[in-house]
Structure formats: structure tokens, C-alpha cells
């Protein structure tokens, strides 16, 4: 097998093998809406380390405590190196905390700046007017509003920011995470699809969530949460050919994609996908301070001449990946009259 390393175009969704991101908004919305609004299928198995007798450990409750009128600002960046070129973006979002129609605190964010490959992208009037409502308040649901008027270059930053909130929301829903080292495993395993039925005729991945309250710094009162998206013991993805069952990594394969070319041939890939998301939050307020996402996919790919994927060429092995960083930017101080809202 030949081997290559590819850092794929940035998107909140898992990656596609050759031609860029796939399912960008759909997978982020799936995380933000289905996993969080419909938590019934999820099963959490919590584990807490045993502390030595008499020892005390810093404690924190992972919850967001909003202040009405609180100002929010983020810079989010993504780096990608393809086989032939390197691509990157950096974008800035800013907004204010308000209550929505149901009385729930929401971060009402707009997008102010966007650079792609070190060139500033002029945002259209519709993109500047777009509002991304995000909330970590208890009982709040994450979702995306209508994106039809937003220019394409802004879709990745919008969905990538949502993905960080979705992961932190999953962690905040694990109420056993109160001390450094506390751990919860959230089993899901059902496939997420990004197939469009035309070019991508099959595209699925499946993950569980391995969540750890890694540390609480007593000096800075910053809590670090790690959310790993890991292959389930038995991923429920569809593998149409027997060769796809052979493990690409050290777990069962949890990523599959089949593309139909304009010439009637098929590009079929299978692999192991993981995410590692690290989020630093202010322990007292739950506000995000910074975050990183690392998303590698180890892939074995074949070019096939039949729809059954049995008449295929030699396998090609490579690694997809992307890295995203998020940081909170300084904002003006709150007016003294604004009191914390819990």
C-alpha cells in the first residue's frame, strides 16, 4: 500500500477522502440537535477515581451561568494541508447574551471578519446580518437557523463553532463530572450519514463519546474538559464489501464512503475516525476560554469498476485530518448593574 498524510479542509463534520469537506452543517446540527435534544438513546457510564483517605480535590460543576448583556467574542481558526496545497481560515464572531422568547439565555452571535488563506473575504450584507444563537444553559437546545443566505466561505466557521458547543454541552449533561479525573462514557454508535445520493452514494461514520474532566487549576480556576469521539465496539455503519471489514486501525472501522465518478467507476474508502476535543472553561461561569479539536481519519481506499465493490484496484492508505482552535477574545466589562443570572 502507498501511504500519504492529508490534513483535510476544515469542517465540523468528519472528512471526505479526496475532494474536501462533506456534511459540514449536517453533522454539526446532528451533534447539536439530536444528541442533545433527544438524549434518550444515549447511555452514560460514569466512573470516579478513588481519592486517598483525607485527601481533597478541587471541585466544579460544569454549568454555564450567564449574565444578561454579557459580551462574547471568539476567534476560530482551521488549518488544512492537502496533497497539492495548504488551506486555512480564521474568523471572528461577537455578540451579546440575551433571553430568547422562551426566557432562555442565548449567545446571539454575528460574524464580523473572515480570512481564507490569508486573504480577507468581504462578507455580504446577508452574512453580516446572520445571527448564530448558541446556548449552554440548562435545557437549551442547539440548532442552526436558516443558512440559505450565508455565503459559502462562512459555513465552516459557523458549524465548527457549533461543534465545540455541542461537545461542551455533552460534557455538561454528565452531572457526575465534578472533580478532576471524573470520567463518563456516553454510548451512541448509530451512524451519521452525509451521502447526497448522487456523487457520494454512501457516507457514514459512528462514534461514542468518552468525556473526562481532566483538570481544575486552583490558581486560575480554569477547568479543562476532554471529549473524545471514539469508535464504538460495534459501529453500525454499512460496509458493502467484505474487504471493508478488515481493520484499518486498532478498532473496528467506523468510517465509510463510496463516491461514484462521472465515468461510472467507484472510489470506496473505509477507515478509523477519532476526534479529540479539549475545552478550557472558567469554572465559576462555564464560559469557554479556549478550545482545540484534532480529527484524524486513517483510510484505506480502492478504485472499483462495479457497484458491489468487488472488482477493485490495489489499496491506497492515507490519513485525513484537521486541526481547529478557538479562543475567547477580550470584551468590554459588564456594567455594574448587571447581576449574575443562574
Task: List the model feature ranges, each with a label.
Residues 45-342:
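Signature of exported/secreted
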Residues 32, 42-44:
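Cleavable N-terminal signal peptides
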Residues 1-21:
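N-terminal secretory signal peptides that target proteins for export/translocation
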Amino acid at each position: 500500500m502507498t501511504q500519504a498524510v492529508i490534513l483535510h479542509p476544515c469542517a465540523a463534520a468528519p472528512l471526505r477522502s479526496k475532494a474536501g469537506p462533506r456534511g459540514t452543517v449536517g453533522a454539526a446540527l446532528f451533534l447539536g440537535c439530536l444528541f442533545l435534544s433527544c438524549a434518550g438513546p444515549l447511555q452514560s457510564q460514569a466512573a470516579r477515581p478513588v481519592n486517598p483517605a483525607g485527601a481533597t480535590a478541587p471541585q466544579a460543576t460544569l454549568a454555564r451561568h450567564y449574565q444578561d448583556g454579557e459580551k462574547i467574542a471568539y476567534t476560530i481558526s482551521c488549518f488544512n494541508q492537502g496533497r497539492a496545497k495548504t488551506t486555512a481560515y480564521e474568523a471572528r464572531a461577537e455578540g451579546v447574551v440575551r433571553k430568547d422568547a422562551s426566557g432562555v439565555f442565548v449567545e446571539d452571535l454575528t460574524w464580523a471578519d473572515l480570512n481564507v488563506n490569508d486573504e480577507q473575504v468581504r462578507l455580504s450584507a446577508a452574512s453580516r446580518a446572520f445571527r448564530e444563537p448558541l446556548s449552554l444553559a440548562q435545557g437549551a437546545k442547539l440548532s442552526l437557523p436558516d443558512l440559505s443566505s450565508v455565503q459559502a466561505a462562512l459555513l465552516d466557521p459557523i458549524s465548527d463553532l457549533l461543534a465545540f458547543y455541542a461537545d461542551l454541552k455533552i460534557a455538561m449533561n454528565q452531572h457526575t463530572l465534578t472533580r478532576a479525573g471524573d470520567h463518563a462514557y456516553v454510548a451512541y454508535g448509530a451512524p451519521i450519514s452525509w451521502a447526497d445520493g448522487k456523487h457520494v452514494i454512501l457516507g457514514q461514520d459512528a462514534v461514542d463519546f468518552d468525556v473526562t474532566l481532566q483538570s481544575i487549576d486552583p490558581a486560575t480556576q480554569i477547568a479543562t474538559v476532554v471529549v473524545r469521539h471514539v469508535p464504538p465496539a460495534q459501529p453500525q455503519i454499512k460496509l458493502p464489501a467484505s474487504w471493508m471489514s478488515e481493520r484499518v486501525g486498532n478498532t473496528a472501522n467506523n468510517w465509510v464512503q463510496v463516491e461514484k465518478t462521472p465515468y461510472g467507476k467507484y472510489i470506496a474508502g473505509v477507515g478509523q475516525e477519532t476526534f479529540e476535543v479539549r475545552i478550557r472553561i472558567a469554572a465559576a461561569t462555564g464560559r469557554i476560554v479556549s478550545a482545540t479539536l484534532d480529527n484524524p481519519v486513517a483510510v484505506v481506499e480502492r478504485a472499483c469498476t462495479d457497484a458491489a465493490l468487488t472488482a477493485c484496484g490495489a489499496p491506497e492508505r492515507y490519513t485525513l485530518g484537521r486541526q481547529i482552535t478557538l479562543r475567547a477574545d477580550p470584551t468590554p466589562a459588564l456594567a455594574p448593574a448587571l447581576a449574575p443570572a443562574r
